[in-house]
UniProtKB/Swiss-Prot annotation:
One GO location term (cellular component): cytosol
Protein name: Shikimate kinase
UniProt keywords, alphabetically: Amino-acid biosynthesis, Aromatic amino acid biosynthesis, ATP-binding, Cytoplasm, Kinase, Magnesium, Metal-binding, Nucleotide-binding, Transferase
Organism ancestry: Bacteria, Bacillati, Cyanobacteriota, Cyanophyceae, Synechococcales
Binding-site list for substrate: D54, R78, G100, R157
Location in or out of the cell: Cytoplasm
Length: 199
């Protein structure tokens, strides 16, 4: 199920929270797609807890994500990421901002689908603009041609992201507007579970 363009929520948030029955919401998408900035207001509106998986990984490793990549490589980082996701999935009533590459490990999908997976699909031009304005060090973009690297990653991951239960296409909406759009879309998914993972 996909959604683009946001309008006023039809279902009240308390009713929606009850219908979710404690299922966590996992936000997936490329780096810079706004998973953390959208996740916080989404969690606040639902009365859920918020978890930034990358922050938990850094806490567990005792160093930054770029340092983990430098020390342990991509495979080492992905292993730690899966361990952290497994621990997070034991809890409920959370909005979880995941790392951009969490979808690349098949074993993570069983954990993600313990809740509802929401893909924040930012149009490529907007994504590049966001990343250029962001001072965060992105290990996978430390190349001579970051734009080409970003496009290659997006092409590789797009089929994986499309396995999400909900797809929200984002242009230049604010994180708060995206959070409201997700809340507007969720009742349809909960009403008809057969719509999960369809576009």
């Amino acid at each position: 199920m996909s959604y683009s363009g946001f309008r006023v929520m039809a279902d009240s948030t308390p009713t929606l929270k009850k219908r979710l029955s404690g299922r966590s919401l996992y936000l997936v998408g490329m780096m810079g797609s706004g998973k953390t900035s959208t996740g916080r207001p989404l969690a606040e509106r639902l009365g859920y807890g918020f978890v930034d998986a990358d922050a938990v990984i850094e806490q567990a490793a005792g160093c930054s994500i770029p340092e983990i990549f430098e020390r342990d490589g991509d495979a080492g980082f992905r292993s730690l990421e899966s361990q952290v996701l497994s621990a997070i999935s034991q809890r409920h009533s959370l909005v979880v901002a995941t790392g951009g590459g969490v979808v690349t490990q098949p074993e993570n999908w069983g954990l993600l689908h313990s809740g509802i997976v929401i893909w924040l699909d930012v149009v490529p031009d907007q994504l590049l603009q966001r990343l250029n304005a962001d001072s965060t060090v992105r290990p996978l973009l430390q190349t001579t041609d970051p734009e080409a690297s970003l496009n290659a990653l997006l092409n590789e991951r797009r089929p994986l992201y499309s396995e999400a239960d909900l797809t929200v296409v984002i242009n230049d909406e604010t994180p708060e507007a995206v959070a409201d759009g997700i809340l507007q879309l969720l009742p349809s998914l909960l009403q008809d579970p057969t719509q999960r993972r369809t576009d």
